[in-house]
């Protein structure tokens, strides 16, 4: 049989399938993942998102958003390009505001009790 170098045709449908050779190569059919793994991933994602939401809630408390000064609002729709700014005056104004804020600080009045700091 094998001496005459003729091809032997097989009637096996699995061997002659058009994608039989391609299944072992690079682009085969994608394997279905078990549904248990998907549910575990979904649970992990929900836990992570809950943790992120808790962290984001804390960030809202620490925002130092000061109210907008009405002096900075330009009426009439004018543009601010080309406006000359007196930085000296602005620095003095900020310095005066900072001095007023320093009067309210309680840190200067704090005196630690040395007895509490012992090992």
Curated annotation (Swiss-Prot):
Family matches, as InterPro entries: Histone_chaperone_domain_CHZ
Composition skew (Polar residues), residue ranges: 1-10
UniProt xrefs under Pfam families: CHZ (PF09649)
Main location: nucleus
Biased composition (Low complexity): 11-21
Biased composition (Acidic residues): 39-63, 98-119
UniProt subcellular location: Nucleus
Name assigned to this protein: Histone H2A.Z-specific chaperone chz1
């Amino acid at each position: 049989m094998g001496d005459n170098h003729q091809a032997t045709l097989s009637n096996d449908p699995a061997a002659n399938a058009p994608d039989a050779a391609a299944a072992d190569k690079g682009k085969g059919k994608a394997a279905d993942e078990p549904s248990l793994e998907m549910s575990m991933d979904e649970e992990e994602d929900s836990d992570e998102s809950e943790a992120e939401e808790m962290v984001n809630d804390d960030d809202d408390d620490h925002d130092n958003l000061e109210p907008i000064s009405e002096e900075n609002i330009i009426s009439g729709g004018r543009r601010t390009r080309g406006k000359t700014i007196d930085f000296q005056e602005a620095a003095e104004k900020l310095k005066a505001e900072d001095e007023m804020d320093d009067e309210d600080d309680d840190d200067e009045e704090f005196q630690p009790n040395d007895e509490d700091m012992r090992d």
